[in-house]
């Protein structure tokens, strides 16, 4: 085991503080509408330019092990804010830096670190309650666009496209962000349920122009096994032919003579038919077939529930207004399932999302909810260069997280104003002793830091602006983008309450741990001496060779 280096007390805390400040100083330059860019070097390819706090934080590693520990703990603050709310990483970092700096001064002055931490926790909890209670619901397109705009560093195009996407697919819909091919941002919306399986044979194609299968108001047969024997399918085919409607088969697979017979029937016009594989694999495939059954008002033909294909009737088939298939995807529009059944299924899947511990499973379940409840929107990000594309895509993702958070818990005035109002709201808060009250004061002072940093980045005098905002009330604040004072909500400067709350909680938690640190242990740096040069001994007798 390698030897360890141990530092105690003030020595340890000062080293840690250096790391905290290096990381926070790099991150906080990006805060606000006039935040600056940070350029990150990459081992391969062009450097990345970003105004995203967590991207900057993730890049920073310090050579000194003890300083690096401080930096990594603040990085944890940014990551926590990013994971929980998807935004607010820079605000969280600024808050943590302010609490740690003030807190360590108080520890050096002889105050009890544990009492300071209790005071900080008390103030943070009270401020969080204030933020929650002052939040206003965010439901209309305009406020969603404003939240997206602020989070995307005042890019109104991004805010507008996110608001449009949310309007089209609803709050439950899935919105994904992809790299586009043009210069402009584009929005693609798929209504209905889309899944990534295409037609099994090109002979099913009905629209030669775009090489797709399109059937209006078809019957939909759902089977959770392979179909290779045509005899099993005959009763259903005959019933559908009599009804004079098209048939779409969604099964684990259709192969051999069954597929050949379907193709021949289709080409001769005896019955319009098309087939595709069921989406997903294993248990997820069964669940998705069940989703399609509920959406279309049909029944999955499965031997597990005692149903076989030969006994299937028209009652077992689902229906939809339209079913389209391309080579890779299929879309069911306007399934005939009852709204109550679909709602019950959505609630059941939501319960599974709450219970699952796997992020991957939660994401897949959320996709299923979207397919049943809303739709899927894809935002294609356009840019002139690869570097700009990456930077813009990161901002769109940030803005998307922020708007989701706003819809979830409401909005508060932005620009650091809600935290300034929280300071006033907890002005009378006292601890159980002097040191705890000092902890409360530290947290209150720190809550002014985001506003001061936004103003500093805009090139104004922080103390003057902070004093003026403190003197106002309600939503009165300073718009650093235009240099105007006024009502932040009316000026469209909003922050999601969840983002502000998460930033404060993450900062208070990690900063409290740092203030109460008394010892630090790290590996001793190894002395990397060069390889020893072998001595030239044993060659001394060469003189006699002359």
Curated annotation (Swiss-Prot):
<comment type="function">
    <text>Together with its co-chaperonin GroES, plays an essential role in assisting protein folding. The GroEL-GroES system forms a nano-cage that allows encapsulation of the non-native substrate proteins and provides a physical environment optimized to promote and accelerate protein folding.</text>
</comment>
<dbReference type="GO" id="GO:0005524">
    <property type="term" value="F:ATP binding"/>
</dbReference>
<feature type="binding site">
    <location>
        <begin position="87"/>
        <end position="91"/>
    </location>
    <ligand>
        <name>ATP</name>
    </ligand>
</feature>
<feature type="binding site">
    <location>
        <position position="415"/>
    </location>
    <ligand>
        <name>ATP</name>
    </ligand>
</feature>
<dbReference type="GO" id="GO:0005737">
    <property type="term" value="C:cytoplasm"/>
</dbReference>
<keyword id="KW-0547">Nucleotide-binding</keyword>
<keyword id="KW-0963">Cytoplasm</keyword>
<comment type="similarity">
    <text>Belongs to the chaperonin (HSP60) family.</text>
</comment>
<dbReference type="Pfam" id="PF00118">
    <property type="entry name" value="Cpn60_TCP1"/>
</dbReference>
<comment type="subunit">
    <text>Forms a cylinder of 14 subunits composed of two heptameric rings stacked back-to-back. Interacts with the co-chaperonin GroES.</text>
</comment>
<dbReference type="InterPro" id="IPR027410">
    <property type="entry name" value="TCP-1-like_intermed_sf"/>
</dbReference>
<keyword id="KW-0413">Isomerase</keyword>
<feature type="binding site">
    <location>
        <position position="51"/>
    </location>
    <ligand>
        <name>ATP</name>
    </ligand>
</feature>
<keyword id="KW-0143">Chaperone</keyword>
<feature type="binding site">
    <location>
        <position position="495"/>
    </location>
    <ligand>
        <name>ATP</name>
    </ligand>
</feature>
<feature type="binding site">
    <location>
        <begin position="30"/>
        <end position="33"/>
    </location>
    <ligand>
        <name>ATP</name>
    </ligand>
</feature>
<dbReference type="InterPro" id="IPR018370">
    <property type="entry name" value="Chaperonin_Cpn60_CS"/>
</dbReference>
<dbReference type="GO" id="GO:0016853">
    <property type="term" value="F:isomerase activity"/>
</dbReference>
<dbReference type="InterPro" id="IPR001844">
    <property type="entry name" value="Cpn60/GroEL"/>
</dbReference>
<dbReference type="GO" id="GO:0042026">
    <property type="term" value="P:protein refolding"/>
</dbReference>
<dbReference type="InterPro" id="IPR027409">
    <property type="entry name" value="GroEL-like_apical_dom_sf"/>
</dbReference>
<dbReference type="InterPro" id="IPR027413">
    <property type="entry name" value="GROEL-like_equatorial_sf"/>
</dbReference>
<keyword id="KW-0067">ATP-binding</keyword>
<protein>
    <recommendedName>
        <fullName>Chaperonin GroEL</fullName>
        <ecNumber>5.6.1.7</ecNumber>
    </recommendedName>
</protein>
<dbReference type="GO" id="GO:0051082">
    <property type="term" value="F:unfolded protein binding"/>
</dbReference>
<dbReference type="GO" id="GO:0140662">
    <property type="term" value="F:ATP-dependent protein folding chaperone"/>
</dbReference>
<dbReference type="InterPro" id="IPR002423">
    <property type="entry name" value="Cpn60/GroEL/TCP-1"/>
</dbReference>
């Amino acid at each position: 085991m390698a030897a360890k280096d141990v530092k105690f007390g003030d020595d340890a805390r000062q080293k840690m503080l250096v790391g905290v400040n290096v990381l926070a100083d790099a991150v906080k330059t990006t805060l606000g509408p006039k935040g600056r860019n940070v350029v990150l070097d990459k081992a391969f390819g062009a450097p990345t330019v970003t105004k995203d706090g967590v991207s900057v934080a993730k890049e920073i590693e310090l050579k000194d092990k003890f300083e690096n520990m401080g930096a990594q703990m603040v990085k944890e603050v940014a990551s926590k804010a990013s994971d929980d709310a998807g935004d607010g990483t820079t605000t969280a970092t600024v808050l943590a830096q302010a609490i740690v700096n003030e807190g360590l001064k108080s520890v050096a002055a002889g105050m009890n670190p544990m009492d300071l931490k209790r005071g900080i926790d008390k103030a943070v909890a009270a401020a969080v309650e204030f933020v929650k209670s002052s939040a206003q619901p965010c439901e209309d397109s305009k406020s969603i666009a404003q939240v997206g705009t602020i989070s995307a560093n005042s890019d109104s195009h991004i805010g507008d496209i996110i608001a449009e996407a949310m309007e089209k697919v609803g709050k439950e819909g899935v919105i994904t962000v992809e790299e586009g091919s043009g210069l402009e941002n584009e929005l693609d919306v798929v209504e209905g349920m889309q899944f990534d399986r295409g037609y099994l044979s090109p002979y099913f194609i009905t629209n030669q122009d775009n090489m797709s299968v399109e059937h209006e108001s078809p019957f939909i047969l759902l089977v959770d096994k392979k179909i290779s024997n045509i005899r099993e399918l005959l009763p259903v085919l005959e019933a559908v032919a009599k009804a004079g409607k098209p048939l779409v088969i969604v099964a684990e697979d259709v192969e051999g003579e069954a597929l050949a017979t379907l193709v021949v029937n289709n080409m001769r016009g005896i019955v319009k038919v098309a087939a595709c594989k069921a989406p997903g694999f294993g248990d997820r495939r069964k669940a998705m077939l069940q989703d399609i059954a509920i959406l279309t008002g049909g029944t999955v033909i499965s031997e597990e529930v005692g149903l076989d294909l030969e006994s299937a009737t028209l009652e077992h088939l689902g229906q939809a207004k339209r079913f389209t298939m391309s080579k890779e995807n299929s879309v069911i529009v306007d399934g005939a399932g009852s709204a109550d059944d679909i709602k019950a299924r959505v609630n059941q899947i939501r319960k599974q999302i709450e219970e699952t511990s796997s992020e991957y499973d939660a994401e897949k379940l959320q996709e299923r909810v979207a397919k049943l409840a809303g739709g899927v929107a894809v935002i294609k990000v356009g840019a002139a260069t690869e570097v700009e594309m990456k930077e813009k895509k990161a901002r769109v993702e940030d803005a998307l997280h922020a708007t989701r958070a706003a819809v979830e818990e409401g909005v508060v005035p932005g620009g650091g104003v809600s935290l300034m109002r929280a300071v006033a709201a907890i002005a009378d808060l006292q601890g159980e002793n002097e040191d705890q009250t000092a902890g409360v004061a530290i947290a209150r002072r720190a809550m002014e830091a985001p506003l001061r940093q936004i103003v500093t980045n805009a090139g104004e005098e922080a103390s003057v602006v902070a004093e003026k905002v403190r003197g106002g009330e309600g939503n009165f604040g300073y718009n650093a983008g235009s240099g105007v004072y006024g009502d932040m909500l009316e000026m469209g400067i909003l922050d999601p309450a969840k983002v502000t709350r998460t930033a404060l909680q993450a900062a208070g938690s990690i900063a409290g741990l740092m203030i109460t640190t008394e010892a630090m242990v790290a590996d001793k740096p190894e002395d990397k001496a060069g390889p020893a040069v072998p001595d030239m001994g044993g060659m001394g007798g060469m003189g006699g060779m002359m």
